[in-house]
Amino acid sequence: MLSIIAGFAALIWSADKFVEGAAATARQLGMSPLLIGLTVVALGTSAPEILVSIMAAMDGHAGLAAGNAIGSNIANIGLVLAITALIAPLPVKNSLILREIPLLVAITLLAGWCLLDLHLGLVDGILLLSGLAITLYLLFRWQKPPLAAENQQLADNEADEIPDIPLARALAILLVGLTVLLVSARALVWGATEIALLFGVSDLVIGLTVVAIGTSLPELAASVASALKGHHDIALGNIVGSNIFNLLAVLAMPGLIAPTHFETEILLRDYASMLALTLLLAAMAWLALRRGGIGRYSGGILFACYSAYYVALYFTL
C-alpha cells in the first residue's frame, strides 16, 4: 500500500515536470505554442497511464495495463466529469459535438473491435497507434483557418502556459521528470500487483479500480479547481481528449509489448460500461446545446452510472 501511495504521489509530480520540461524544450526548438498544446502537452498529460501500462505489460501484467486504460475512461466520465458538472454546468461547444465527441465514439468502437476476440495482439496495438497518428493529424487540421481568430487566441493562451526558460534547464526538467516517472510507474505497478495477490483478485480488477482512479486524480483535481475558479468550460474538452489518448496510446501498449488473452468480463462488463458511458456523454452533450450545458442533473446521472458499475464489478469478482 505504501508503494502505491508513494508511486501515485511521485507519478503526479513527475508528470507535471515532464510536461513542463517537454513543452519548454519544444518551445526553445521552435515549435508553435498551438502545436505544442495539441501534441506535447496532450500526450504528456497521458504519460502516467502510458508509463504504467508499459511497465505492467513488460512485467507480464497485461490485464493491469488494459484495465488502466478502460478504467481511466470510465472514471473520467463517471467520476471526474460528473463531479465537475455537479459543481457548475459545463458549456458545450459546437465543434466538440461535430468533431471531437464523434471521434471519441469512433475510437471507442475501434477499441471494442480490437477486444472482440478477447485477444489484444500486435496487430491491434499497431492499429491503435496508427489511429493515434491519424487523430493527432486531425486535431492539428481542425485548428487551421477559417477559425484563424479563435486559433490566435488559443495560441496566445497556450504561449502563456508554456514556460520560457533556457534550453539546458528545460532539458534538465524533462529528464528529471521522465526519470521519476519511470521509477514511480515501476513502484506503482509492483504495489498494485502485490495487492492483487494479497486479496486474490486479478490484475485486471486492480487496473480497473485502484490504478485507474489513481491515474485519474490529476484530471479530477484540475477539473474541480477549474470549475471552482469559473473556468469549467475547458473540462469537457480535456476529458474527451484524455479518453481518446487512453484508448489509442495506453490500450495499445499491452498489444505491442505482451499480447494476451482476456476473460469475457473485459468485453461484456468493462468495455460495455465504458461504451455506454461514452454514448451517454455524447447524448448529453448534444442535448446540452439546447439546454445551455451539461448540468447537475446530468452529472448526478453519470455518477450514479459510475457507482452502479462498481457495484456490478464487486458482484462479478
PLM regions and their residue ranges:
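Hydrophobic alpha-helical segments, chiefly the membrane-spanning helices
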Residues: 1-317
